[in-house]
């Protein structure tokens, strides 16, 4: 157990990131505009890493559309971060095909590495101040309900 704690401490020291920190973003949207994490500091963000070839990612799109519709007026931003999915034009076709109603950013391998993503989908719930609240890897039957609960908790705590 002591060895595990030491390894974790060394990892945090080596990466310079605390467990609740989230890497900064500066990535293009599909329309070419750049979205920066500084613009999101007062929002609650649901950031989903996905890929066009990931069937589990596709299965989550309807839930993210619902979250966007339900919470966007309350300061919540749903963002799909497309990685390993080809050119922006390929992603744009996919977005239209699957009727994605939330912001889509085009990421790259550096983004995947910065966030420590090793599988898809990978979803982060980020609170105000760009602080990590919770991270979900993969899919589960309760993921959408869990994210809703996270959002509600963060909304109640928001000044």
Regions found by a protein language model. Name each.
Residues 43-45, 49-53, 119:
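Short pre-active-site segment immediately N-terminal to redox-active cysteine/selenocysteine motifs
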